[in-house]
Amino acid sequence: WNRVDWYNGGMEHTARHLLYARFWVQFLYNIGLVPNKEMIWTRVSHGMVLGPDNQKMSKSKGNVINPDDIVKEYGADVLRIYEMFMGDYQMDAPWSTDSLRGCKRFVDKVVRLKDKLNEKSGFTESLEVLQNKTIMKIEYDMTHMGYNTCISSLMILVNAYDELDSITKEDYRLLLQLLNPIAPHVTEELNEMIGYSPICESEWPVYDEAKTVENT
């Protein structure tokens, strides 16, 4: 047996089953039955979504947020974006309906950008640099679980698109590809509407490092 590549769980796991699992692996290692002293290569603890009152959600406190209700009102993609945007992955964060609505406005803006599609692009060198920087940033952030900063980068790109009079289908498709891991439903639907094959079957965009810095 080899080590588990990635173990993800809350801090409550540390003094419960994880403690005993590690004990057994140490024992098996000592008697020569497994090749590694530890059972995990990487251990990550995720934060907890707290209630709006900054306390742990509890029915007795009346501060529980039902995700089914959120999905019905705002959609699964908005909930997914908000949960990733709340803060550092490993830190607790209180629920904020105002911030959730902000994520809904972000998704609405992405949808409205489709109305700007035109063969005459408002392309500039600074936009090309921003696109390449965004791809590079998202690759790094996704790998290092920086989901909140990943979404911030996408918001900057969306705002840049929104300031243009028009954007090409290729530029819009790039945005949809980058947003797809976070909001798969709306991006696949928009992608189909502009005539492309499924994003989930496409190659991830490749950035040009030489174009991540604007010429002066």
Where are these regions (language model features)?
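Alpha-helical recognition segments enriched in aromatics with Gly/Pro capping
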Residues: W1-M91
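Helix-rich, typically C-terminal accessory recognition domains appended to large enzymatic cores
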Residues: L19, N36-K37, D69-T216
